[in-house]
Amino acid sequence: MADSKISPGMQQYLDIKAQYPDAFLLFRMGDFYELFYDDAVKAAQLLEIGLTSRNKNAENPIPMAGVPHHSAQQYIDILIELGYKVAIAEQMEDPKKAVGVVKREVVQVITPGTVVDSAKPNSSNNFLIAIDFDGSHYGLSYMDLVTGEFFATTLSDFMSVCGEILNLKAKEVVIGFEITAEQEEQLQKQFRLLLSYEQEIYTDDTLINPNLSQVEKNVAGKLLQYVHQTQMRELSHLQELIHYDIKDYLQMSYATKSSLDLIENARTKKKHGSLYWLLDETKTAMGMRLLKTWIDRPLISKQAISERQNIVETFLESFIERSDLADSLKGVYDIERLSSRVSFGKVNPKDLLQLGHTLSQVPYIKAVLEAINSPHLSKVIATIDPIPELESLIHSAIDPDAPATISEGSIIKTGFDQRLDHYRKVMKEGTGWIADIEMKERQASGINNLKIDYNKKDGYYFHVTNSNLSLVPDHFFRKATLKNSERYGTAELAKIEGQMLEAREESAQLEYDIFMRIREKVETYIDRLQTLAKAIATVDVLQGLAYVAEKNHYVRPEFASQKVITIQNGRHAVVEKVMGVQEYIPNTIQFNQNTSIQLITGPNMSGKSTYMRQLALTVIMAQMGSYVAADYAKLPIFDAIFTRIGAADDLISGQSTFMVEMMEANQAIQRASHDSLIIFDELGRGTATYDGMALAQSIIEHIHNRIGAITLFATHYHELTSLSEELGHLKNVHVAILERDGEVTFLHKIAEGPADKSYGIHVAKIAGLPGSLLSRADNILKQLESHSKDFIIKDNSQQSEENEPLNLLTEETSSQDIINRLKEVDVMNMTPMEAMTVLFDLKKKIK
């Protein structure tokens, strides 16, 4: 109900705000977007802008803050980045012509998942996700409102849903079902997502194939409904929904991708030091986005991989053409982003000029590809359409010096429209006519300083100072009186002014109408532009991969039909790039059909983790269609990679390192297949020694006996190396060490067999620990290695109660049980692992 104390304008604000309670409402008032009440208070703090009040002298002044409309986007970006929604209420009529309160409406709601017009555009996708549940399966759909891409899949459980949300790096998820409080908390707090809710289904058979599963049609329809509700317009650039299955790609969890530094360095959160950084030699924004997608989702189809490899090889063999191609690609703007701006009605003259320039480059790109004359390029060449009629329209219509905004005029080229040319001629000649009138009246009147000026209020007028008022001719009529001068008009000047003002108004309106027609025409080409964008992006990524392969001396990997790996002198591609080729020590990796697990021992800092990551990156590069860092590589095609490396542990969620270890290990145990790759680095280090060792052995046995996946398992539990006697497909390898005159050198080379020492004290020495501490540690180590029975080794230099040997038999209640258990033990026929298990059980009895 309206409040009698509130003005009609503020009541209008409150009515609109009530429709968008979860968003900041930017309320257009003249040249500013204003915020009121709680929105103003909160925005002033978040945006660091001034907080004032409306009706300051009233009993309850209204908090108010505002931002200029021309710079509003930067403030909107800040709010969106912080996870808020922003509703934009525009003036829907000219305030000068309005009767009563100016009509205002919300024209768009901008959310973290629907950003298309950021002041800081980047080359990454921004996916908006929707999820739904039909009682047995989850539907997940996502789209990028910039590129128009639209996908849907079916998932079996909520864990898979969470995994896909993390992989897509979404900021906003639309919920289409009755979500549980636990699920909501996980998405909202643990993953820090903005959750929106939508139950209605938008039906569009042109975008959503009726033959899709019902849960996918429902979730895609709810996503479309949310998009239409927030964007409030038909979006012509949205592409037909594509069904996908996560099993169609090499599956990797978000933790795996993070620990392998695929898109960004896990430690620095920067591009530098990632696989993306290494491989990114793209020249276009579309290519950069596609490269990220390829790294994120390597293929499992040998044919599809080979098609990419064939083009990379073709480019490698065509150095001159590839160089010309790269130069041409540098002149290509972001076609996908430009197409979305057309669809959203936000395209400006500069955007069209960029599109026109891009289209002018396409014939050169196509000609270079055709000159290579390779059958491997025929498919992509067929999709490269220069769209000459659109390029011609833009270049014939848009002035190359056109401003960025439509309202400034001077957009349309002279010669494009006869009426517009006529109005411009009138305005141009009118300026000359006014100059002639000025000269004529100056001579006739004898007023030597007589001149004609212009302002919006009085139009054109003669400026006459008070000292010359006696010379003013009779046909002059007064328009305005100032302190030291008068302003006059004449019938002749008024006539010319009328013609010029009419020409100016008609010209401005006509130019606007012409631009709108051109924009509508461009919109009809969006499908062809998107096809062109995909083709150029593909060519861009592949030429970049060829450049990287040539520069770094990579080889084309072969794919084996059997589970065998031969990587000769393989390198960790990213580490090699950072260190330099001369510094990096390559390693050969081999798995035959009789080996599925390599148990890797050796000291920290010796290169175990790099060796394991090297294999994972080689697999990813190979299956995305890239060449790999090796002298020779032959691999099977893997269906998934599971890792537990630990570089990207996130303890903020409240989970311990050990819990994270076990969760990631469990994911591999539950989901890995015979065709997967498993990489475990120091599994079990997050708990007590015997706990960790027991779990490590059990997991190794499970992988060996039940899964059969190729596995690299690095461990500091040297006792586990004895498992090779029991597990026929397990092979011990270690990092070679050169020990001479008490000094240790890490060779960073993998050798067969288990490590004989851990060299932990040497690593501590490198880290700079005090000499006295190292000497004490060395003394303890020697006593342990001599099988001392004491649990704590005495320090002869410092006697204290704390150095006394630990007596396990301090309680009579437990001593007899322990004695009985020891009597049962057959020491001579026990393995080291069984002996440790017994000791572990005994230790638990005395706790």
Swiss-Prot record:
PROSITE patterns: DNA_MISMATCH_REPAIR_2
Binding of ATP, residues: 602-609
Pfam family, one: MutS_IV
GO MF annotation, one: mismatched DNA binding
InterPro entries from the UniProt entry: DNA_mismatch_repair_MutS (IPR005748), DNA_mismatch_repair_MutS-lik_N (IPR007695), DNA_mismatch_repair_MutS/MSH (IPR017261), DNA_mismatch_repair_MutS_C (IPR000432), DNA_mismatch_repair_MutS_clamp (IPR007861), DNA_mismatch_repair_MutS_core (IPR007696), DNA_mismatch_repair_MutS_N (IPR016151), DNA_mismatch_repair_MutS_sf (IPR036187)
One GO biological process term: mismatch repair
Gene3D superfamilies according to UniProt: 1.10.1420.10, DNA repair protein MutS, domain I (3.40.1170.10), MutS, connector domain (3.30.420.110), P-loop containing nucleotide triphosphate hydrolases (3.40.50.300)
Keywords in alphabetical order: ATP-binding, DNA damage, DNA repair, DNA-binding, Nucleotide-binding
A single cellular component GO annotation: cytosol
Function description: This protein is involved in the repair of mismatches in DNA. It is possible that it carries out the mismatch recognition step. This protein has a weak ATPase activity.
HAMAP family found in the cross-reference section: MutS
Family: Belongs to the DNA mismatch repair MutS family.
Name recorded for this polypeptide: DNA mismatch repair protein MutS
